[in-house]
UniProtKB/Swiss-Prot annotation:
The keyword Nucleotide-binding applies. Catalyzes the GTP-dependent ribosomal translocation step during translation elongation. During this step, the ribosome changes from the pre-translocational (PRE) to the post-translocational (POST) state as the newly formed A-site-bound peptidyl-tRNA and P-site-bound deacylated tRNA move to the P and E sites, respectively. Catalyzes the coordinated movement of the two tRNA molecules, the mRNA and conformational changes in the ribosome. It holds the Pfam family EFG_C. Belongs to the TRAFAC class translation factor GTPase superfamily. Classic translation factor GTPase family. EF-G/EF-2 subfamily. Residues 8-282 form the tr-type G domain. InterPro entries: EFG_II, EFG_III, EFG_III/V, EFG_IV, EFG_V, EFG_V-like, EFTu-like_2, G_TR_CS. It comes from Halothermothrix orenii (strain H 168 / OCM 544 / DSM 9562). This is Elongation factor G. GO terms for molecular function: GTP binding; GTPase activity; translation elongation factor activity. The keyword Nucleotide-binding applies.
Length: 689
């Protein structure tokens, strides 16, 4: 099957935003105008096309990023819908990895919310070119220019308006286009009919001022435009668009547009901007990877004539076809029914069917080409972040890093007969979501699930019931504490010697143990010289230490951020074995960690509460009562924003408490910030449990 759209006319974009900025509605409208959906779904009715999992429709939030295809002006646009809720940032990170450009959506009233900052930082990390759309211009308190200021202050973005609104709130009627210097006014409710007219008199002066700002911003990035601008020459629309496109692709400028997706205004102009300014797969640097055979770096250019390479970025359990693997093709062509090589795992798999997903129906494809996003049926052993490629030209593309879960709960089926069903279902869900982990507690035999927050785990339990028909009970959430040491201890001995009749055991090690900075993990340094311990036993010593670290020395939590130097020891010709050295390593670690002033660390969350003035005192008092550390306050519209660091252990049930304290008028977001030592009195409680 030949390529349907040239690479130059393909756009892979994501829509990133804070919860409630109107992302799903905007995507809906895009699908409507590009002719793929005939009746628009409203999130308020739970009918939006993108939100295809049932719980999303109930909660009105988007959880999984479905990849959807549509066309506009002879271009193919693949949209990845990304969730905006803090517990799902991993989904966002995962989708940013496979996009070429993004639309950052802001609410005209709320502006830059905490989650927008997180997502923006993630997009900076992957150098994603973006344009911004200030949505909800029809809402009370909408202020386009304030949002621009917030983008500059809070995100450090070089935000340049390409449009200004005509009116706002109920009087929002249209848009002034600063690139073409005319106005767009809408003729009907569906916003399909609009016309370009002269800029209304009372907006002329403001339009000219912002046009000047636009030209100034562009001339700083483009010398030719700078010359023309300084000499007062006319700059054509095409020249302006070309320079703007370059600025966006270099991630030096963020053009800002405005509109109201709900009222169907501004969406077509947003689609035009996607085509004018966001990159095609050819405009982004070729993807880099490592050849697993030679361990050398290689690149894959976006082109059908290159060897096939793709990245699996999402796994979903689909009720009709089983496991769906969403993947992005970076180079080459893939035929349905052919074999691919999973270079991350080192084995071959056969692709069954290839589906191009539209939000609620799917189209079968015989083949997919460089730059395409599609879903494959039949890949049994491929996980998120795996590379799929041509076996004769293997490459491993950089995988994604996922944060460790911060919260865990025990889970059990309501009837014991469903235990196997539960285990299978949890395994399927863990395959889909790398930040969701399942393990069995060896001491109690309980199944423990871990995730990124209460909502994350609630959604999982919800899905168990709906998709897998397993009714489960969950225990009280537990915090993922860690342990570490605070001082260096040298010459710690670990001896494991049993020499009484028969084959003996002999392992003897001497180590230094010292703390590392937060987040540095575990470092093992081998300084054995002169064969004091034979080479083949060294890995066993490390294994013994790593295993002992899993259960810490204070309260059974994993020990982190420490360095062990193996410096001496002794062995016995006959009695030494890997097992003996493994046990010696573990004895030395426990001994050393006990002496190195161990402490318990707890996860501290970055909490932001948006609260009406009159409840401010109660909210701050409550945060202090939760061992919170208030970092600052600022006004936002008619509310106050309180920022604080609060231990996760104190945040359980906060949503309910906050609702009752403020009659439901305050909202909060929290995300993991860092670990810090627990106060002594609380450490005693934790150890005593």
């Amino acid at each position: 099957m030949a390529r349907q759209y040239p690479l130059k006319k393909t756009r892979n974009i994501g829509i990133m935003a804070h919860i409630d900025a109107g992302k799903t509605t905007t995507t809906e409208r895009i699908l409507y105008y590009t002719g793929r959906v005939h009746k628009m779904g409203e999130v308020h009715d739970g009918a939006a096309v993108m939100d295809w999992m049932e719980q999303e429709q109930e909660r009105g939030i988007t959880i999984t990023s479905a990849a959807t295809t549509c066309e506009w002006q002879k271009h193919r646009i693949n949209i990845i819908d990304t969730p905006g809720h803090v517990d799902f940032t991993v989904e966002v990170e995962r989708s940013l990895r496979v996009l070429d450009g993004a639309i950052a959506l802001f609410c005209a009233v709320g502006g830059v919310e905490p989650q927008s900052e997180t997502v923006w930082r993630q997009a900076d990390k992957y150098q994603v070119p973006r344009i911004a759309f200030v949505n909800k211009m029809d809402r009370m308190g909408a202020d386009f220019f304030h949002v621009i200021e917030m983008m500059e202050d809070r995100l450090g973005a070089n935000a340049v308006p390409l449009q200004i609104p005509i009116g706002s709130e109920d009087d929002f009627e249209g848009i002034v286009d600063l690139v073409t210097m005319d106005a767009v006014v809408y003729k009907d409710d569906l916003g399909v009919k609009y016309e370009r007219v002269d800029i209304p008199e009372d907006y002329r002066e403001q339009a000219e001022e912002y046009r000047e700002n636009l030209l100034e911003a562009i001339s700083e990035l483009d010398d030719e435009i700078m010359m023309k601008y300084l000499e007062g020459e006319e700059i054509t629309t095409d020249e302006l668009k070309t320079a703007l496109r370059k600025g966006v692709l270099d991630v030096e400028i963020v053009p800002v547009l405005c509109g109201s997706a709900f009222k169907n205004k501004g969406v077509q102009l947003l689609l035009d901007a996607v085509i004018d300014y966001l990159p095609s797969p050819v405009d982004v640097p070729p993807v880099e990877g490592m050849n697993p055979d030679t361990e050398e770096e290689e690149i894959r250019k976006a082109g059908d004539d290159e060897p096939f390479s793709a990245l699996a970025f999402k796994i979903m359990a689909d009720p009709y076809v089983g496991k769906l693997t969403f993947f992005r093709v970076y180079s080459g062509v893939l035929e349905a029914g052919s074999y691919v090589y999973n270079s991350t795992k080192g084995h071959k798999e056969r692709i069954g069917r290839i589906l191009q997903m539209h939000a609620n129906h799917r189209e079968e494809r015989e083949s997919v080409h460089a730059g395409d996003l599609a879903a494959a049926v039949g890949l049994k052993n491929t996980a998120t972040g795996d590379t799929l490629c041509d076996e004769d030209h293997p490459i491993v593309l950089e995988s994604m890093e996922f944060p460790e879960p911060v919260i865990s709960v025990a889970i059990e089926p309501k009837s014991q007969a469903e235990q196997d069903k539960l285990s299978l279902a949890l395994q399927r869900l863990a395959e889909e979501d790398p930040t969701f982990k399942v393990r069995t507690d060896e001491e109690t035999g309980q199944t423990i699930i871990r995730g990124m927050g209460e909502l994350h785990l609630e959604v999982i339990v919800d899905r168990l019931l709906r998709e897998f028909k397993v009714d489960a009970n969950i225990g009280r959430p537990q915090v993922a504490y860690r342990e570490t040491i605070t001082r260096k201890v040298t010459d710690v001995e670990g001896k494991f010697i049993r020499q009484s009749g028969g084959r003996g055991q002999y392992g003897h090690v001497i180590i230094d143990i010292e703390p590392l900075e937060e987040g540095e993990g575990f470092e093992f340094v081998n300084k054995i010289v002169g064969g004091a311990i034979p080479k083949e036993y060294i890995p066993a010593v490390e294994d013994g230490i790593v295993e002992a670290m899993e259960n810490g020395v204070l309260a059974g939590y994993p020990a982190v951020d420490l360095k062990i130097t193996l410096k001496d020891g002794s062995y016995h010709e006959v009695d030494s074995s890997e097992m003996a050295f493994k046990i010696a390593g573990s004895i030395a670690f426990k001994e050393g960690a006990q002496k190195a002033s161990p402490v318990i660390l707890e996860p501290i969350m970055d909490v932001e509460v948006v609260v009406p003035e009159e409840y401010m005192g109660d909210v701050i008092g409550d945060l202090n009562g939760r061992r919170g550390n208030v970092q600052g306050m600022e006004r936002r519209a008619s509310a106050q924003v309180v920022k604080a660091y609060v231990p996760l252990a104190e945040m359980f049930g906060y949503a309910t408490d906050l609702r009752s304290k403020t009659q439901g008028r305050a909202t909060y977001t929290m995300q993991f910030s860092h670990y810090e030592p627990v106060p002594d009195n609380i450490a005693k409680e934790i150890i005593g449990k």
